[in-house]
């Protein structure tokens, strides 16, 4: 970690950089380290600018044509922009659980997840219109389960006549890498297989555009922990969101960002308010649990709920 954090500039490529943010946040919280998480996140989202690195690799923050593509990961510069589905899925793996260890970034991660889940649909042949994809005549073989590998701002590589002036364009690298590779190799098994990351993390709520994000789902090496969910409200008004209790016993909802209980003794469903443009980071506790201070953290018994710095 010391060698990583002491780099002079971003070396981001593919998926490893955001995992550094998760590791740093956990080391800071559980072992008293002081790694600069903001630096790692800036390196990730603003991208690599090193002339001897993967220059331009980062997170896209634009509209392409009529479509919002904010949050997709890939090259910010290649042909005006080239996003990849695998990389966009994979960033959620470390960043969503990261907020369990440092809630200061809960709002930013919640907003990013709303953007990227919205934009990811554009890789799927039945979710983007035929005029904006490279191989619509073969899309039936995908059954809308296999997506295109990439999404370009324009068809910079193949320059297909029918796609001239179109933005964005769903396509893939397959045919250009190996001579004789079929056009259908634009549909990507390796990318689409990782949709399970979103599948494990993301759930709808009773309010459109407010997602329930499971912060435990991809925190594979965590210690004992309570269910933790991130919610982000993109609206300019307060919204009431409801939590459904799947446990057999009653639960309480504790927001680690505001350090308050939002609802208690929920047997079936409990609702809470999220201020405009804000996030809630909810820990689901057995009803009546006693929160105590332990080594700078909130804990129930020997199980840490959250760091006080949240």
Regions found by a protein language model. Name each.
Residues 17-35, 45, 58-83, 129-159:
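Carbohydrate-binding/catalytic loop surfaces
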Residues 70, 74-134:
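Membrane-proximal bilayer-interacting regions
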Residues 88-99, 135-203:
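C-terminal capping/lid segments that line or modulate ligand- or cofactor-binding pockets
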